[in-house]
Amino acid sequence: MWRLLTRAPAPLWRMHFSDTWAALPTSAGLKTLLPVPTFENVSIPERSKLKFVERVPLVPKVRREPKNLKDIRGPSAEATDFTEGNFAILALGGGYLHWGHFEMMRLTINRFMDPKNMFAIWRVPAPFKPITRKGVGQRMGGGKGAIDHYVTPVKTGCLIVEMGGRCEFEEVKRVLNQVAHKLPFPAKAVSRKTLEKMHQNQKERELNNQNPWTFERIATANMFGIRKFLSPYDLTQKGRYWGKFYMPKRV
């Protein structure tokens, strides 16, 4: 015969707080909740939504330009840090933004965001670089073709759209990643903390690197005659940028 053993009641620990006794539950029921953000210092502008971007620049005459692929090569020197918002879309490669990409970002973000508690701003200019095309069936020669459309060149590390307001990163991360996957170059959603962490991780990898055979050492010492296959740009950027592509794992 099994003996029915009755469970002893859970003990209650009593502590004295300012001449009053309070019964505390056992440790299994304790929870630590993070404080709710107040957003006291956040100000929402009057026009909180993304503005419409013109398809053609408002100039009297546009000069036809060569390709100038250096516009999308290497790291960006503009729009690399946050200005007003706390969340943004970070470009992880170079490429060109067409007018359709601007409309896709504007419509997707404006439909999602609450204009009373959120705002979004552009960090890249409107399309200004002319791209020429020739008609189908034309013979070769005859000079440069007519202007077909305009694009905006973007480099690696440039912030494209910036968001902020009375919201957290988890609320806008899904929409920003949804927009980033539709862009013509690699991109992802970042916040101020994640962007700083990315820069810190890159510096730590450079300081704590245990592999002595780095790209910079091999190229500087001209091992195996590699200098004849490299350009001065490769020596400056230490091989991290190959045209419009960015290789973050290379130290």
Swiss-Prot record:
Pfam families: Ribosomal_L16
Targeting presequence: 1-29
Keyword DNA damage recorded: no
CC per GO annotation: mitochondrial large ribosomal subunit; mitochondrial small ribosomal subunit; mitochondrion
GO molecular function, one term: structural constituent of ribosome
Disulfide bonds: none
Gene Ontology BP terms: mitochondrial translation
Location of this chain's protein in the cell: Mitochondrion
SUPFAM superfamilies: Ribosomal protein L16p/L10e
CDD domains membership: Ribosomal_L16_L10e
Superkingdom, taxonomy of origin: Eukaryota
Subunit structure: Component of the mitochondrial ribosome large subunit (39S) which comprises a 16S rRNA and about 50 distinct proteins.
Protein name listed in UniProt: Large ribosomal subunit protein uL16m
Source species: Rattus norvegicus
